[in-house]
Amino acid sequence: MKFAFAIFVVLAILHTELISATEYKCKVTGTGDMTIPFGCKDGNDVQGCKKLCQEKCKYTTTRQSCVGKKCYC
């Protein structure tokens, strides 16, 4: 019974980590730029990046870029 409970706890923790990894978290860099990990579908998703910067982070700027899946604005 303890073994089954331990497995349940581990699965619950993994599930929580996976959900939080898919949330868009706005982070400000030391240079004042905003970054959003996993904010771009690909390196060309600048419009999606711009939308996230404005709606999710409440951050407006004239330039947005995607490097891999990371959004910079």
Curated annotation (Swiss-Prot):
Q: List locations, semicolon-separated.
A: Secreted
User: Which keywords fit this entry according to its UniProt record?
Assistant: Ion channel impairing toxin, Potassium channel impairing toxin, Secreted, Signal, Toxin, Voltage-gated potassium channel impairing toxin
Predominant location of this chain?
secreted
- Signal sequence range: 1-21
> Please, what other remarks does the record include?
Exhibits anti-inflammatory effect in mouse carrageenan-induced paw edema assay. Attenuates delayed-type hypersensitivity reactions in a rat model. Reduces migration and invasion of NCI-H460 cancer cells.
Sum up the protein's function in the record's words: Salivary protein that inhibits host voltage-gated potassium channels Kv1.1/KCNA1, Kv1.2/KCNA2 and Kv1.3/KCNA3 likely via a voltage-independent pore-blocking mechanism. Suppresses expression of the Kv1.3/KCNA3 channel in lipopolysaccharide (LPS)-stimulated mouse macrophages and human T-cells. Down-regulates secretion of nitric oxide (NO) and inflammatory cytokines, such as TNF-alpha/TNF, IL-1beta/IL1B and IL6, in LPS-stimulated mouse macrophages in a manner dependent on Kv1.3/KCNA3 channel blockage.
Query: This chain belongs to which protein, by name?
Result: Salivary protein FS48
Native species of this protein? Answer: Xenopsylla cheopis
The organism that produces this protein has a lineage beginning with: Eukaryota, Metazoa, Ecdysozoa, Arthropoda, Hexapoda
